Swiss-Prot record:
<dbReference type="GO" id="GO:0030308">
    <property type="term" value="P:negative regulation of cell growth"/>
</dbReference>
<feature type="modified residue" description="N6-acetyllysine">
    <location>
        <position position="321"/>
    </location>
</feature>
<feature type="modified residue" description="Phosphothreonine; by TAF1 and GRK5">
    <location>
        <position position="55"/>
    </location>
</feature>
<dbReference type="GO" id="GO:1990841">
    <property type="term" value="F:promoter-specific chromatin binding"/>
</dbReference>
<comment type="function">
    <text>Multifunctional transcription factor that induces cell cycle arrest, DNA repair or apoptosis upon binding to its target DNA sequence. Acts as a tumor suppressor in many tumor types; induces growth arrest or apoptosis depending on the physiological circumstances and cell type. Negatively regulates cell division by controlling expression of a set of genes required for this process. One of the activated genes is an inhibitor of cyclin-dependent kinases. Apoptosis induction seems to be mediated either by stimulation of BAX and FAS antigen expression, or by repression of Bcl-2 expression.</text>
</comment>
<keyword id="KW-0597">Phosphoprotein</keyword>
<feature type="short sequence motif" description="Bipartite nuclear localization signal">
    <location>
        <begin position="305"/>
        <end position="321"/>
    </location>
</feature>
<dbReference type="GO" id="GO:0051262">
    <property type="term" value="P:protein tetramerization"/>
</dbReference>
<dbReference type="GO" id="GO:0005634">
    <property type="term" value="C:nucleus"/>
</dbReference>
<dbReference type="Pfam" id="PF00870">
    <property type="entry name" value="P53"/>
</dbReference>
<keyword id="KW-0043">Tumor suppressor</keyword>
<feature type="modified residue" description="Phosphoserine; by CDK5, PRPK, AMPK, NUAK1 and ATM">
    <location>
        <position position="15"/>
    </location>
</feature>
<dbReference type="GO" id="GO:0003677">
    <property type="term" value="F:DNA binding"/>
</dbReference>
<feature type="short sequence motif" description="[KR]-[STA]-K motif">
    <location>
        <begin position="370"/>
        <end position="372"/>
    </location>
</feature>
<keyword id="KW-0804">Transcription</keyword>
<comment type="subunit">
    <text>Forms homodimers and homotetramers. Binds DNA as a homotetramer. Interacts with AXIN1. Probably part of a complex consisting of TP53, HIPK2 and AXIN1. Interacts with histone acetyltransferases EP300 and methyltransferases HRMT1L2 and CARM1, and recruits them to promoters. Interacts (via C-terminus) with TAF1; when TAF1 is part of the TFIID complex. Interacts with ING4; this interaction may be indirect. Found in a complex with CABLES1 and TP73. Interacts with HIPK1, HIPK2, and TP53INP1. Interacts with WWOX. Interacts with USP7 and SYVN1. Interacts with HSP90AB1.</text>
</comment>
<feature type="compositionally biased region" description="Basic and acidic residues">
    <location>
        <begin position="283"/>
        <end position="295"/>
    </location>
</feature>
Amino acid sequence: MEEPQSDPSVEPPLSQETFSDLWKLLPENNVLSPLPSQAMDDLMLSPDDIEQWFTEDPGPDEAPRMPEAAPPVAPAPAAPTPAAPAPAPSWPLSSSVPSQKTYQGSYGFRLGFLHSGTAKSVTCTYSPDLNKLFCQLAKTCPVQLWVDSAPPPGTRVRAMAIYKQSQYVTEVVRRCPHHERCSDSDGLAPPQHLIRVEGNLHAEYSDDRNTFRHSVVVPYEPPEVGSDCTTIHYNYMCNSSCMGGMNRRPILTIITLEDSSGKLLGRNSFEVRICACPGRDRRTEEENFRKKGESCPKLPTGSIKRALPTGSSSSPQPKKKPLDEEYFTLQIRGRERFEMLREINEALELKDAMAGKESAGSRAHSSHLKSKKGQSTSRHRKLMFKTEGPDSD
């Protein structure tokens, strides 16, 4: 059905008037009116005007039209919700644990360290008894590489840090958040790496995509003329006591010798402690290590520990019975010596009697000691008789 055409002579309803006609309906000086609320009220349509729209007769060819609905007002944007606090960063867990077992391989790979004492002024010192390196933060730590025969060309040396304790060995060793934000980068090392190589522009810092572990790799260089070993200078860029990092957990540094394809040629490791006073900490730990070794001495071969009686562990142990029941005859020259030794003997007998009373706590045992003391008195008389004879050798 075709829609009837509108007659141009018919005036359109109010809702379709032009903007100029609507502007004329506004009260004068509405913009500069001191009462803006009253001017806004004048703009509001009265109920009579609305009723007039509905009762107005439309033209012959035009149906009454309803006023167009006002466009929907977009809802006011909600106030931005406060951002939730970022969760604490969780350290990534490694899917594999590198081996720390010493493996010299066919080239006799091993490590060496410079000899240094335990003075407070040292910045790096190694303890052979503990196989542990004590060093300060970001200080030079020379590590010597020894081989019996030269490895093939393209050999590399990799250094990696892992936690020593089994409950933390799967965690990746990295710097604490505070030291990560420090501006001490040399342009090559990522800020989260703990181990760096000093004075080597060929160092490569690796982040394994599978294990997430950090390592630094340098090409192996043969010893210089007149030297028997190759020295690499490492730096440790975080303290062992830093919260959020190692957090006082002991770590190991694993040094591996690899060929150009990554095949293992040798492996060695040592423990590391990064602290403020390496000499003092080394001296303290070595003393504790020696004390622990002295408190648990090794038993000789074939020795058997004798089990203690389960009766009274707190009471003093009695002497061996064969020694208590044996009697000896002693020939003494001179009465003065005899009286002195007799008093000593009586004092010892009295001491044994008092010890027996404390352990047993019975009169029967004390009477036995008195009878034993009487026997010793008769023995003294016998000794006195012998002293009257000729002197003996």
